[in-house]
Amino acid sequence: QADPAIQVQGVSKSYRLVRDRPTSVKEAVVRRSRRQTVEDFWALRDIDLAIPRGSFFGLIGHNGSGKSTLLKLLAGIHRQTTGDITVNGRLSALLELGAGFHPELTGRENIYLNGAILGMNRRQMAAAVDEIVEFSGIGDFVDAPVRIYSSGMYVRLGFAIAVHVNPEILLVDEVIAVGDEDFQRKCLDHMEVLRSQGVTIVLVSHDLDQVRDLCDRVAWIDRSHLVEVGDPGGVCDRYVASVDAEGREE
């Protein structure tokens, strides 16, 4: 069996939370003798996951379960606290609205900037820029500073860049839900094209119908732990049953 596109072994991620932080200098002096408590919040615990090359891989779970944290670790934006992550291939990611954009630069300048970050040279980006602008549909706004963009324009340009830099692995958090329905359809259709070209796609989504339609494998993450990985139909059904059961308990 070929190496997976992404291998995650024993990965955990913790963040330090400082409790009882003073709100003013005076309060800090008055309370100097009282100790602040520092707690570790574990966003992910002991995750083992292999994402096959060329797969369309879904991540599902409640808000705050750890899905987006996992994507940020895979993209190298954050570093895991323990464990190993191996990424085999050139990775492009669309994770947070406006991430990777410099607000004072124009859309066109940001296209070149993002290309450089992803290892594309200026000539390669010059060849792709017209296609990126056309796909994004933002027209003349490409020469305006991105700080004036709407959230929808950010998504359009971000997605257009992410899919036109020849990625071998594409990570997409739910940001495309911000775009209008036509653009969402365009994004999903383009991801299907990339998949047919052998690109590995990892998608975080709350739209379970979308996950069932698009994905060939799904991982369910709950409260920082990996519950199961498997066939989209079965995993989504068990996830829905668990949400329903929790709803009845409340």
Regions found by a protein language model. Name each.
Residues I60-H62:
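The feature captures the beta-strand-to-loop junction immediately N-terminal to the Walker
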Residues K26-S33, Y112, Q124-F141, G158:
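Conserved ABC ATPase "signature" region
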Residues D207-D213:
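Conserved H-loop
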Residues Q1-R45, P232-E250:
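Pre-NBD coupling/linker segments of ABC/ABC-like ATPases
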Residues D213-W220:
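Conserved catalytic segment of ABC-fold P-loop ATPases
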Residues R223-S224, Y239:
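Conserved ABC ATPase "signature" C-loop
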